[in-house]
């Protein structure tokens, strides 16, 4: 059995999280949980999904949030939030022409200069699945950059460097500001899950158990 040590009065939860949960999901969940659990505080570290999983196995984190599942025998991996992947492009006459089409040619759009996430991220795996569904591989793409920061990707797309495939939730703010165009992917390739990940054999304290259950139920309708 694994057991974490904490000071007598500190109710700390060490969280490892991938990019999307860190930027767009946990900012909703943590304040809501904190309202009824004011003595709990969080130490949060952001990296890609694989590093979060590695950190859990190394005892660095108590709880992880990832954009891809883990099948490791020591970890429990529970989906708690569903998102969609979308293509984002600059707002210009060229891409507005695609937008005017009743059914935009996504394969043609993917031949435009593209910005990709680094390997190890759940977003990269989801993007790869869509690209494969088009009968394409990464070798067929005109890759302009590989970047791990979602906000940087969005700003570079808005600035005209290229297109990208990102989380719909992450795209919403710049879409509302008319700084990017968003193209929906086919249903069978667009959906992705986010997961709360934790040790099966960890002796969790009650406030940690409460947080895990709170997250599981937060987006349940």
Q: Model-derived features: where do they sit?
A:
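Flexible hinge/capping segments at coil-to-helix
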Residues: 6-7, 77-115
């Amino acid at each position: 059995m694994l057991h974490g040590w904490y000071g007598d009065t500190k109710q700390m939860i060490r969280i490892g999280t991938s990019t999307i949960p860190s930027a767009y999901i946990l900012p909703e969940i943590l304040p809501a949980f904190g309202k009824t659990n004011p003595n709990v505080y969080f130490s949060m570290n952001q990296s890609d999904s694989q590093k979060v999983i590695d950190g859990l196995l190394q005892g660095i984190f108590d709880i992880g949030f990832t954009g891809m599942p883990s099948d490791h025998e020591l970890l429990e991996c529970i989906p708690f939030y569903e998102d969609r992947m979308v293509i984002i492009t600059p707002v210009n006459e060229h891409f507005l022409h695609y937008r005017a089409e009743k059914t935009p040619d996504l394969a043609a759009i993917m031949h435009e200069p593209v910005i990709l996430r680094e390997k190890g991220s759940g977003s990269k795996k989801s993007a790869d699945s869509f690209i494969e569904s088009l009968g394409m591989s990464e070798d067929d793409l005109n890759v302009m950059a590989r970047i791990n920061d979602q906000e940087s990707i969005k700003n570079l797309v808005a600035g005209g460097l290229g297109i990208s495939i990102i989380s719909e939730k992450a795209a919403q703010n710049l879409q509302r500001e008319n700084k990017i165009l968003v193209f929906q992917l086919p249903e069978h390739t667009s959906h992705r899950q986010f997961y709360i990940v934790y040790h099966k054999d960890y002796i969790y304290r009650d406030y940690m158990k409460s947080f895990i259950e709170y997250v599981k139920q937060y987006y349940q309708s």
